[in-house]
C-alpha cells in the first residue's frame, strides 16, 4: 500500500472540500497544491474530477430536506417551480460560455501566474462588494430567502458566475459576491450559491466523467483506493465547510477571505518569480 499516495489523496480531498464553497477558488488551490504534490498528470486530473463530485454530494446532503421538498411539490407548488427555474436561468450563462470557450481558457490560463493574478483582482472585488453592501440602507428588502428570488435576480447571479471560468476567480466567490453587488443579502447570496453549485458543478463533473469513460485512464488498484479516500475526504470536509459557512455569514462579512486571497496571490507570484518553488505549469 502506497501511504504517500493516500496522504496526497487526503490532502487534495480536504483542499477540494474546504475551498469549493469558500470565495477563494478550489480550482486555483487544486492547481497549485497539485503542482506541489506532483499530482498533475492525467491520473491526477481524473482524480480531481471525481473528488469534486464528493463535494457536491455534501451540499445535496446538507440541503436534502429542501431538495426533497422542491422535488415532491414541483407539480403543485409555484414556489418550487420558480426555484427550479431560477437555478436553470442562473446555470445557463456559465455553462454556455464554458462549452464554447472552456478548452481555450484551460490552455491559456491554467497556470500559477494567471491564477495568482485572479486571486488578487478578486480581493478588490470583495472589498468593493462589502463596502457597497454596508452603504445600502435597504438591501433588497423583499428578499429574505432563496425562495424570494426573481428570475431576473437569478440571471444577474448567473452572469456574475461567468467570471468563475477564469481559474483563481472562484465560482462561489463570483456568485456570492456578484449577488451582493446586485443587491442580494449576504446570507441569501451564499445559500443560492450552494444550490447553484449542484447543476453547474454537477453538470461539469458529469461531462468530465463522460470524457473519462470515452477515453479511460488506467488506474491501478492503489490509485483506485486513493480515489475512494479522496472522495470521502472531499465529502466530509465540504460538509463541514458548508455548515460552518452558513453560520458564519449570518454574523460576519467576507473581508477575512479577501485578505487571505491577496496574501496567497502575492505568495504565489513571489515564489514563481524567484523560483523558490518549481511550479510545473
Curated annotation (Swiss-Prot):
Location(s) in or outside the cell: Cell inner membrane
Cellular component terms (Gene Ontology): plasma membrane
EC numbers for this chain: 3.6.1.27
Top enzyme class: hydrolase
Entry superkingdom: Bacteria
Molecular function in Gene Ontology: undecaprenyl-diphosphatase activity
Chief site of localization: membrane
UniProt record, GO biological process: cell wall organization; peptidoglycan biosynthetic process; regulation of cell shape; response to antibiotic
Catalytic activity: di-trans,octa-cis-undecaprenyl diphosphate + H2O = di-trans,octa-cis-undecaprenyl phosphate + phosphate + H(+)
Bilayer-spanning residue ranges: 4-24, 46-63, 83-103, 108-128, 187-207, 222-242, 257-277
Keywords from the named record: Antibiotic resistance, Cell inner membrane, Cell membrane, Cell shape, Cell wall biogenesis/degradation, Hydrolase, Membrane, Peptidoglycan synthesis, Transmembrane, Transmembrane helix
Topological relation to the membrane, as annotated: Multi-pass membrane protein
Job of this protein: Catalyzes the dephosphorylation of undecaprenyl diphosphate (UPP). Confers resistance to bacitracin.
Record family assignment: Belongs to the UppP family.
Listed HAMAP family: Undec_diphosphatase
General remark: Bacitracin is thought to be involved in the inhibition of peptidoglycan synthesis by sequestering undecaprenyl diphosphate, thereby reducing the pool of lipid carrier available.
Protein name (Swiss-Prot/TrEMBL): Undecaprenyl-diphosphatase
Biological source species: Polynucleobacter necessarius subsp. necessarius (strain STIR1)
Gene it is expressed from: uppP
Amino acid at each position: 500500500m502506497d501511504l504517500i499516495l493516500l496522504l496526497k489523496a487526503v490532502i487534495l480531498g480536504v483542499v477540494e472540500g474546504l475551498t469549493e464553497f469558500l470565495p477563494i477558488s478550489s480550482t486555483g488551490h487544486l492547481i497549485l497544491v497539485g503542482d506541489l504534490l506532483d499530482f498533475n498528470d492525467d491520473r491526477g486530473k481524473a482524480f480531481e474530477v471525481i473528488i469534486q463530485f464528493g463535494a457536491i454530494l455534501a451540499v445535496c446532503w446538507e440541503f436534502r430536506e429542501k431538495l426533497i421538498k422542491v422535488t415532491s411539490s414541483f407539480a403543485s407548488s409555484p414556489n418550487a417551480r420558480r426555484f427550479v427555474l431560477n437555478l436553470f436561468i442562473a446555470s445557463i450563462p456559465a455553462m454556455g460560455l464554458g462549452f464554447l470557450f472552456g478548452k481555450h481558457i484551460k490552455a491559456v490560463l491554467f497556470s500559477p501566474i494567471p491564477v495568482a493574478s485572479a486571486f488578487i483582482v478578486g480581493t478588490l472585488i470583495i472589498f468593493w462588494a462589502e463596502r457597497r453592501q454596508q452603504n445600502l440602507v435597504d438591501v433588497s428588502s423583499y428578499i429574505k430567502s432563496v425562495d424570494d428570488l426573481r428570475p431576473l435576480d437569478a440571471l444577474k447571479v448567473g452572469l456574475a458566475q461567468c467570471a468563475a471560468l477564469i481559474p483563481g476567480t472562484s465560482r462561489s466567490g463570483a456568485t456570492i459576491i456578484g449577488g451582493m453587488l446586485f443587491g442580494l443579502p449576504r446570507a441569501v447570496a451564499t445559500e443560492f450559491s450552494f444550490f447553484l453549485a449542484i447543476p453547474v458543478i454537477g453538470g461539469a463533473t458529469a461531462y468530465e466523467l463522460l470524457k473519462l469513460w470515452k477515453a479511460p485512464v488506467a488506474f491501478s488498484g492503489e490509485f483506485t483506493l486513493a480515489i475512494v479516500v479522496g472522495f470521502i475526504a472531499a465529502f466530509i470536509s465540504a460538509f463541514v465547510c458548508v455548515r460552518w459557512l452558513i453560520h458564519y455569514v449570518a454574523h460576519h462579512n467576507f473581508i477575512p477571505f479577501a485578505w487571505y486571497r491577496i496574501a496567497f496571490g502575492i505568495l504565489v507570484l513571489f515564489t514563481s518569480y524567484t523560483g523558490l518553488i518549481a511550479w510545473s505549469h
